[in-house]
């Protein structure tokens, strides 16, 4: 049969502790062997406590260490158990405590004995001790009934005893406080009385002289200690001994750091985003480095680009819509303007047609009357016919020239009418050119007006255009009527002259009328421009130049250089101050006269507004003047004796007669005085 050692592998290392082997321990001495034998004998002779077996431990209370034997606590016994004094707290130092010292256990426990009072009640308050007053009974809650003996005042001895006891207790507390506040080096030593010792030396030298001479009494006194003396002994701090050397760290030799490594390990200084107490100018890159801005990559969301693109598309669409709307409005305005021009042109054409029809009828009547006298005197009839030719416009003139050859077939008449036709055509061409220039000027003025109006706000444009068109239409109609009247008058005057003079006067008249028309248009445009400017200033809340300069103060005018102050030497200096050889005392005036200035300060219209007291207004009015004053009526409306008379008299009064006596009043009669009305009946009769 193989052993266990043969089955196990052979150990690599064998450790042997020779000190624990009993063969290598030193042999004890005989005396020690005897003591050990005696202790072993006592332990063997000591009776061992028998612990009941499991199931038979009813009523068993383990309290000491030996009650547990070699084991632990008994779980079936429901009391507090401390095997081997494990978990026991506190060691009693009082003399009346029960001390258990068994099997080398040095723990002490304080057990309070159970005590009862006179009635047999257990005194549970004994557990708390006797340090203070305890109220554990019902009688402690009831007010105590003091007897007459207890309520008596204490005598002087008791008062003094209580006073001394209280004083000593307070002094003890105060002295303890003072000692704790003193220096630790100072130690108060209690003063002890001197000690007397009788000293007798021993007879070691063998002298047999009188012993009384050798004995002496020694007085022992403590040496006085200086309270301010520094400590004699220096407390040296214990130096820590070096422990075992640190374990060596096996690592490769240090290598030289590169620039990149140094930059990676650089810790930037902290820069606050809220405070800069020293006012340093810190660049933005330093702030980003301190905040760690370069450590993280900035990621921009794609929605920013989408949002920007959407805004751009929306803006382009809005611009296109606005431009289309503006183009549509411009076209509508152009159409409206063309429509108004067509309407005005048609109105002018209708007026011309109407005037030409009236002139044609008048001309035919005159031609019929002239044809009767044509056989008598051809030359005179031609002159009269030229004089009687009424002023006509272009259409009537062209129609008349067409009808003239049909009436007269003579060659002279043809030549005369041909000359007249040429003159009329030339005048018509001049008038057409003038009309074209006038229309071009008016169109330019309208274009300039439209360009100015386009710069105004869109809200006021419609109203302003309508107002301008209405004003222009009225002015144009007025000018056309004036021109037609002037043309008719001048043509009637010019037709009376000779043919050669009429052609020259026609050119001069056209030139003069054109010049006057241009001047009128210029004045009209200037007035219109001034009105528009004032309108814009009023709409914007600004004042016009006239109102602004009129409302300025004199100080503002002086500051702006607009005040035209005319200064003269007479107004600045007094003339009496010049050409005098002495001071003011010679020739300036008397002391009682008030002629300091050469002329009054205010003159003209300003002097009329200055208050001047009347010369006769002195405080010398008499009682008669006050009584004669008309207080209730007009001046001079007083009665006889200077008594004032009011404007409106009371009813039932008559001031035609003067009063000679005092005022007599009639007593008002009551109905009780005449109950039957006899007085009224007598008055009626």
Curated annotation (Swiss-Prot):
Residues 370-381, 495-507 have a biased composition (Acidic residues). It comes from the Eukaryota. Residues 30-41, 93-102 have a biased composition (Low complexity). InterPro entries: SKI-int_prot_SKIP (IPR017862), SKI-int_prot_SKIP_SNW-dom (IPR004015). GO terms for cellular component: spliceosomal complex. Belongs to the SNW family. This is Protein snwA. The gene is snwA.
